[in-house]
């Protein structure tokens, strides 16, 4: 009887092993059904999938990816797919709701940007990358962490390589039987992107004019990666004639800087183009944001590479012609965030502004979580500092062994946690001090003093979060010592920095990168 049971179990094991092999064979020979959101995602995914899948696209040309609302039919299409690929939650803002509505766990969801850090979106840039040497950070006041970031990474060939790699890795992990094909396809596609990247670098690295003016601020990554400055203007669209007032101010701006071209996301109407030419003396040209191609355009042979090369050709109408440095119409850098304010605007604050549980960012610097931040800063500095130099600079600034701080505004206590050991002291407000930096901007230190005589090194503390009046802090830099408040005022090189304990390292890196 025992032999029969063992034989039966062996047969069952062989049967299931055979079934698993057959299932893998069917998957290996069959095609993966992939739904993508809009054109760049579709293009990059096809480059990875090749002949091993059927790739479709939800949005037609002319559809705004931000505002798209998927129909019931669209949801079902995603539900029935093997994989769903999108660019980023900041681009396809509707995707988070779609993910929640999916009932099938078989759908592999792929985010093109992966763990890529993004820069601040238009209108959210705090303009202080040049202030790093005096540590003039800005406070972030957005409640959400999605809408404030720029998702247009595909307009930089350099960053598009990372997007393709992310899609490749995610699909290879989901379908290991097809991984070799996906990797081979991606390698071929990435080589084409590298060639495009070389073309952009060769054409723009020695540009005679580094600034270009655009009506659609989608080209920040392209500008960043190839050493240019994107200047965004408002009040001008390709299909609506500017007001007489706007034409008058634009005309002065154009003449002041010798601007020859304004770039639009699509062909400007003849009326708009004529008005700009006649009244402002500037021509209209197209830089495509590549959010969609029509079926007719694709059948005619247009694709990501042809459009990007056309963009480069059009951009060179500006970059190949020497001219004075073009500055934005309005100087948006002299804000309270960046240290420009009047003395009368500075108000006293209470410890409750910093209530909560806070974690040091220093461990994330040590483990490499912040490495992308240094790469971004190096590019923003345009050669003034390298990524390694930024990391060294911030290593000095962030360094601390106080890994956590808990602040109770009601009890007016601060608890310092070092290697698991806690020390709690009670604090009274000791006033504020306005510090003036060599470049002309300023900062405010809000001072507190411990009541306990045994507070030691934590006797005096000073907060700096780049706010100048009562408001809830999102992060802060803390200075502490046992000698005097005056001695702490002189500390400009070492500023331990703290973010909410509920944030992940990547979330903190993203916040730092956008400031």
From Swiss-Prot:
* Signal peptide from the UniProt entry: 1-28
Specify one Pfam family: ZinT
InterPro entries attached here?
AdhesinB, Bact_metal-bind_prot9, Calycin, Lipoprotein_PsaA-like, ZinT_dom, ZnuA-like
Task: Answer whether the UniProt record assigns the keyword Zinc to this protein.
Answer: yes
- The positions annotated for binding Zn(2+) are 66, 152, 216, 291
Region (His-rich loop) spans which residues? Answer: 129-148
Q: Which GO terms describe its biological process?
A: cell adhesion; zinc ion transport
Q: Where is this region: Disordered?
A: 125-148
Any one GO MF term held by the record is: zinc ion binding
Q: Which terms are listed as keywords in the entry?
A: Ion transport, Metal-binding, Signal, Transport, Zinc, Zinc transport
- What domain comment accompanies this record? The His-rich loop facilitates the closure of the zinc binding site and is required for zinc acquisition.
Function noted in UniProt: Part of the ATP-binding cassette (ABC) transport system AdcABC involved in zinc import. Binds zinc with high affinity and specificity and delivers it to the membrane permease for translocation into the cytoplasm.
Family of the protein in this entry:
Belongs to the bacterial solute-binding protein 9 family.
Q: Which protein, by its recorded name, is this?
A: Zinc-binding protein AdcA
Q: Could you tell me which species this protein originates from? A: Streptococcus pyogenes serotype M6 (strain ATCC BAA-946 / MGAS10394)
């Amino acid at each position: 009887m025992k032999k029969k049971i063992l034989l039966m179990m062996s047969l069952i094991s062989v049967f299931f092993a055979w079934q698993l092999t057959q299932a893998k064979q069917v998957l290996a020979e069959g095609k993966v059904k992939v739904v993508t959101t809009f054109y760049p995602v579709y293009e990059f995914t096809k480059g990875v999938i090749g002949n091993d899948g059927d790739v479709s696209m939800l949005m037609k040309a002319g559809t705004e990816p931000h505002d798209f609302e998927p129909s019931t039919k669209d949801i079902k299409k995603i539900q029935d797919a093997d994989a769903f690929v999108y660019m980023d939650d900041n681009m396809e803002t509707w995707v988070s709701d779609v993910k929640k509505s999916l009932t099938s766990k078989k759908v592999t969801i792929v985010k093109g940007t992966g763990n890529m850090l993004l820069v601040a979106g238009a209108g959210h840039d705090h303009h202080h990358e040049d202030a790093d040497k005096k540590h003039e950070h800005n406070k972030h006041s957005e409640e959400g962490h999605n809408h404030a970031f720029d998702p247009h990474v595909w307009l930089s060939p350099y960053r598009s390589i990372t997007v393709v790699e992310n899609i490749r890795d995610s699909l290879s992990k989901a379908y290991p039987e097809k991984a070799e094909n996906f990797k081979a396809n991606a390698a071929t596609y990435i080589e084409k992107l590298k060639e495009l990247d070389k073309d952009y670098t060769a054409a723009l690295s020695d540009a005679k004019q580094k600034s270009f003016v655009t009506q659609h601020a989608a080209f920040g990554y392209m500008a960043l990666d190839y050493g240019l400055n994107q200047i965004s203007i408002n009040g001008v669209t390709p299909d609506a004639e500017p007001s007489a007032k706007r034409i008058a101010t634009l005309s002065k701006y154009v003449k002041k800087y010798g601007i020859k071209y304004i770039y639009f996301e699509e062909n400007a109407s003849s009326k708009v183009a004529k008005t700009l030419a006649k009244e402002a003396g500037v021509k209209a040209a197209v830089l495509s944001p590549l959010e969609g191609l029509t079926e007719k355009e694709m059948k005619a042979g247009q694709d990501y590479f042809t459009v990007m090369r056309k963009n480069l050709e059009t951009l060179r109408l500006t970059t190949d012609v020497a001219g004075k440095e073009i500055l934005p119409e309005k100087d948006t850098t002299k804000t309270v965030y960046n240290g420009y304010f009047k003395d009368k605007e500075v108000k006293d604050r209470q410890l409750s502004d910093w209530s909560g549980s806070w974690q040091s960012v220093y461990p994330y610097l040590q483990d490499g979580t912040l490495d992308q931040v240094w790469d971004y800063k190096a590019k923003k500095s345009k050669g003034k500092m390298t990524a390694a130099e930024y990391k060294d600079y911030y290593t000095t600034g962030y360094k601390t062994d106080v890994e956590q701080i808990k602040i109770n505004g009601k009890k007016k206590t601060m608890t310092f946690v070092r290697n698991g050991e806690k020390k709690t002291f009670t604090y009274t407000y000791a006033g504020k001090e306005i510090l003036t930096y060599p470049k002309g901007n300023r900062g405010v230190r809000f001072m507190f003093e411990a009541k306990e005589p045994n507070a030691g090194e934590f006797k005096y503390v000073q907060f700096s979060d780049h706010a100048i009046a009562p408001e809830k802090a999102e992060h802060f830099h803390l200075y502490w010592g046992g000698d005097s408040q005056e001695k702490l005022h002189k500390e400009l090189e070492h500023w331990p920095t703290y973010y909410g304990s509920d944030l992940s390292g990547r979330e903190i890196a993203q916040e730092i990168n956008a400031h």
